[in-house]
């Protein structure tokens, strides 16, 4: 956590570091938070909350945020301090010129344990660089390329105005945090530099596949909230609608594959119920997702179909290097 905080401190008084102690673990988070608050008054703010999980931690951070823009940084991760200064300069210049953007996107690095060659998630193929633009100017994303929490900075007021409220005691809310505000984003800025270091590979990490399967109920909870947060088929403009449907397909595919990989009747029933609910409540969306390549791939019949789904998933894992 110290490494995380220290990486943001070079931003000086232009940053507000809200350190939230969730109370979920008996560690020294609050002690460290208060230490930095005393050492850097006006920059660091220590906030304690009763255990509410990751989602409530983000909610608490947003409630306490007074800055123009809001970014979530996990305590295991860190920012490139030089790139942070560049981000602050861009935001400062845009603000002084009267240009208020809703979302700033920067690249992030997958810092995987034991891996020398780090994968960079860049958006140079999809977004124009160093200018304010809208969704109409967005190009197609590559397979495996998405806007994630690690890459996004949102305008604070926009997040509060759109009523973003993440569920308590739930992992995997990062997807909802990024997804739900997208229809409210009108002005975007892309900085083609590697700002965020995403530390992955620990055995106990929430994105570890075994851990995800053990928390599959929470993955499905987030999946449902993403489906219900807006009528995605009515989202404008068309390019944003296309992206949001694709991302929803990806999340639903992950939920489905993990249920299949678990091999338990309980989780296979979860998968069946999710697709049935989607069909009952949002038939046009269900039809679009179910008839697509991914929807067909995770709904192949029988044990042979499940084995083929898992094989395809493993090949995708190997190719893209996730988990």
Where are these regions (language model features)?
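All-alpha amphipathic helical-bundle segments outside canonical DNA-binding/catalytic cores
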Residues: 237-246
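Catalytic core of nucleotide-sugar-dependent glycosyltransferases
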Residues: 193-202, 208-237, 254, 258-283
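Membrane-interface aromatic/basic loop that binds lipid-linked glycans or pyrophosphate carriers
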Residues: 261-323
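Nucleotide-sugar donor-binding/catalytic module of glycosyltransferases
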Residues: 1-218
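Inter-domain helical "communication" segments and dimerization helices
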Residues: 115-119, 123-125, 160, 217-221, ...
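Catalytic-loop motifs flanking and including active-site residues across diverse enzymes
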Residues: 177, 222, 248
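P-loop NTPase catalytic cores that bind/hydrolyze ATP
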Residues: 245-257
């Amino acid at each position: 956590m110290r490494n995380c905080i220290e990486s943001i401190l070079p931003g000086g008084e232009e940053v507000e570091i809200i350190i939230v102690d969730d109370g979920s673990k008996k560690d020294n988070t609050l002690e460290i938070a208060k230490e930095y608050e005393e050492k850097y008054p006006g920059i660091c703010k220590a906030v304690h909350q009763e255990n509410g999980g990751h989602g409530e931690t983000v909610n608490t951070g947003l409630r306490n945020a007074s800055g123009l823009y809001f970014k979530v940084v996990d305590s295991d991760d860190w920012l490139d301090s030089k790139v942070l200064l560049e981000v602050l300069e861009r935001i400062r210049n845009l603000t002084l010129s009267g240009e208020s953007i809703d979302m700033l996107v920067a690249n992030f690095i997958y810092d995987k344990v034991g891996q020398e060659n780090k994968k960079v998630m860049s958006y140079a193929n999809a977004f124009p660089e160093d200018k304010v633009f809208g969704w109409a100017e967005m190009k197609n994303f590559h397979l495996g390329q998405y806007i994630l929490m690690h890459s996004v900075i949102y305008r604070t007021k926009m997040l509060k105005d759109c009523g973003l409220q993440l569920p308590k005691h739930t992992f995997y809310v990062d997807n909802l945090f990024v997804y739900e505000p997208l229809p409210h984003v009108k002005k975007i800025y892309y900085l083609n530099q590697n700002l965020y270091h995403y530390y992955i590979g620990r055995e106990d990490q929430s994105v570890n596949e075994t851990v995800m399967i053990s928390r599959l109920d929470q993955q499905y909870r987030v999946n449902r909230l993403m489906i219900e947060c807006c009528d995605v088929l009515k989202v404008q403009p068309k390019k944003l609608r296309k992206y949001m449907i694709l991302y929803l397909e990806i999340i639903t595919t992950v939920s489905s594959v993990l249920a299949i990989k678990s091999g338990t009747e309980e989780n296979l029933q979860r998968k069946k119920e999710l697709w049935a609910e989607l069909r009952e409540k949002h038939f046009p969306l269900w039809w679009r997702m179910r008839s697509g390549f991914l929807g067909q791939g995770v709904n192949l019949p029988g044990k042979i179909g499940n084995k083929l789904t898992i094989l395809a998933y493993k090949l995708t894992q190997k190719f893209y290097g996730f988990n």
